[in-house]
Amino acid sequence: MKNIKLISWNVNGIRAIAKKGFHDWINKENPDILCLQETKAWKEQLDDSLINIDEYTSYFSEASRKGYSGTAIYTKEKPIEIKYGIGKEEFDSEGRFVIAKYPEFILFNIYFPNGKAREERLKYKMNFYEAFQNYVVDLKNKGKNIIICGDVNTAHKEIDLARPKPNSKVSGFLPLEREWIDRFLAAGFIDTLRMFNNKPEIYTWWDMISRARERNVGWRIDYFFISESLRKNITNAYTLPNVMGSDHCPIGIEIKI
């Protein structure tokens, strides 16, 4: 068996984070697999230092619109297969997926849509949730071990945000969004952090304009989910709230497989 350390981080712009100690942080943290969301760049816009990092192979999923969305994986072990979507153009065109198949599991790195902008984006978000769930449940039902990480853009329970009552009618904490997470977990997936820590005030995103991070007025909207089949393999799940550079902090899991 080997120990694998996975980290996920919405970096809110990979070129911006590169100027804020990103390479030093990777060297120090030394994940086996690093998943990034909201990279906001096409690969052709990146310096070689961001494409080729030491012992990692990198894979980038780009939105058709420049400077928007985007996901990336840096991995020490080369995957058997990489996909950049679930076969639905309306979702795949926004660069929201990097799906890496390894011998022991399939890893989904996803930047889920934000539904705050307008009603049609909320509808898009909910349709995205359902399409993704159908896709991943089908794989799980075929006996695949699944790891899912990324910015889900929804806080699941009241414990997952500092101010639940004032936000009960805000996208990101709407009943229909929260109910989707209920359904998703009921379909055979686990919120890994809550296996190890049921304390309040554990957040992964803070509003930058109001300097909410200084007061820890945040939301937990970034997750590592696993299929039930991997429950016994997870040895740790955590957040890294002291890592700066984005409006999100990184999250991690360790798995023995």
State the predicted function of each range.
Residues 1-53, 63-69, 156:
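N-terminal, active-site-proximal structural segment of metallo-dependent hydrolase catalytic domains
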Residues 3-12, 104-116, 149:
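Active-site-proximal beta-strand elements of phosphoester/diester hydrolases
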Residues 10, 26-44, 107, 136-158, ...:
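Active-site beta-strand/loop signature of hydrolases that rely on acidic residues for catalysis
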Residues 33, 54-57, 130-217, 221:
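Metal-dependent phosphoesterases centered on the DNase I-like endonuclease/exonuclease/phosphatase
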Residues 40-42, 47-115:
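Structured beta-strand-rich core segments of catalytic domains in phosphoester-bond hydrolases
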Residues 66-81, 211-232:
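Conserved beta strand-loop-helix elements of the APE1-like EEP
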Residues 76, 100-103, 227-228, 253-257:
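Active-site beta-strand termini and strand-to-loop segments that position acidic
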Residues 87-88, 113-129, 166-169:
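Surface-exposed cleft-lining segments at the edges of enzyme active sites
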